[in-house]
């Protein structure tokens, strides 16, 4: 089936994804892999076209495309442009907190949260990945080109979908500029249609589910001239997963990036 398809989406565990790719002999078949297996592999395009014209061009021309990880998508969207613009050095020591809905854990976790025997711990936020070995760390470091892995704090909470990924920085960590320069870099980089800049807060609160059910991403900058919060809001099932895969497919097919996607205006 893979060899007879024009485009195939792999939604498999890493080992199975690697085996599936090895079965493809048709040089015209385009593979979009949603697993972790090929996100930093040579010869594979990384499926985040908004990062640069080069990223987009590679997706369009490639037969092998790795769909970004949900947590990694937010971190990379925030950090990559600042490294590229020279505002943040590659030697920056960074941390990242990523809040996600329980659908990101797959069928087993969804069943745990929605089952009749739901335990008390599942009604509160739960931090995981405490050993600092989360599988998204590799692509976070590699794609951004930073020297060190960030300290990464993923948290799953009692709601279905939506992500809020925050990277805090001190202004003195910047090689040049300040909070307004960061906003300017993002505004130039992310002007739609899928990734945009703005303020998703309401009454001083920022909801991780603000873009639940959509395929876009909103980049927000908060703080002051000393301490700055960089935040990406999106759906872990949208721009963090299937929405990103469909966006890459659109590019391969010569369509607009947002064709068939649900984008909040």
State what each model feature region is:
Residues 1-122, 126-128, 220-224, 264:
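N-terminal Rossmann-like NAD(P) cofactor-binding subdomain of oxidoreductases
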Residues 51-56, 64, 107, 133, ...:
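Short capping/connector residues at structural and topological boundaries
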Residues 70, 173, 236:
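Residue-level signal for short, function-critical loop segments
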Residues 76-83, 137-141, 183, 243-250:
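Predominant activation on well-ordered alpha-helical scaffold segments within soluble catalytic domains
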Residues 92-93, 97-98, 102-231:
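C-terminal substrate-binding/catalytic lobe of Rossmann-fold NAD(P)-dependent oxidoreductases
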Residues 216-265:
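NAD(P)-dependent Rossmann-like dehydrogenase/reductase catalytic/cofactor-binding core
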């Amino acid at each position: 089936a893979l060899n007879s398809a024009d485009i195939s989406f792999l939604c498999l565990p890493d080992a199975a994804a690697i085996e599936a790719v090895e079965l493809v002999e048709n040089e015209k078949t385009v593979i979009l892999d949603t697993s972790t297996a090929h996100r930093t592999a040579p010869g594979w395009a990384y499926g985040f076209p908004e990062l640069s014209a080069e990223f987009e061009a590679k997706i369009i021309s490639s037969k092998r495309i790795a769909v970004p990880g949900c947590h990694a998508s937010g971190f990379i969207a925030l950090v990559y442009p600042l490294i590229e613009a020279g505002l943040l050095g590659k030697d920056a020591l960074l941390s990242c907190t990523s809040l996600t809905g329980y659908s990101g854990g797959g069928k087993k976790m969804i069943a745990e949260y929605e089952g009749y025997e739901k335990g008390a711990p599942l009604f509160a936020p739960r931090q995981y990945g405490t050993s600092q070995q989360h599988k998204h760390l590799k692509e976070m470091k590699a794609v951004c080109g930073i020297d060190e892995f960030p300290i990464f704090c993923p948290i799953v909470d009692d709601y279905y979908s939506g992500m809020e990924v925050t990277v805090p920085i001190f202004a003195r960590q910047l090689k040049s500029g300040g909070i307004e320069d960061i906003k300017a870099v993002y505004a130039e980089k992310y002007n739609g249609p899928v990734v945009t800049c703005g303020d998703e807060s309401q009454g001083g609160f920022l909801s991780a589910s603000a873009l639940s059910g959509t395929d876009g991403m909103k980049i927000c900058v908060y703080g002051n001239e000393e301490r700055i919060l960089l935040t990406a809001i999106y759906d872990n099932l949208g721009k963090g997963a299937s929405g990103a895969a469909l966006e890459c497919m659109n590019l391969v097919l010569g369509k607009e990036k947002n064709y068939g996607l649900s984008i909040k205006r």
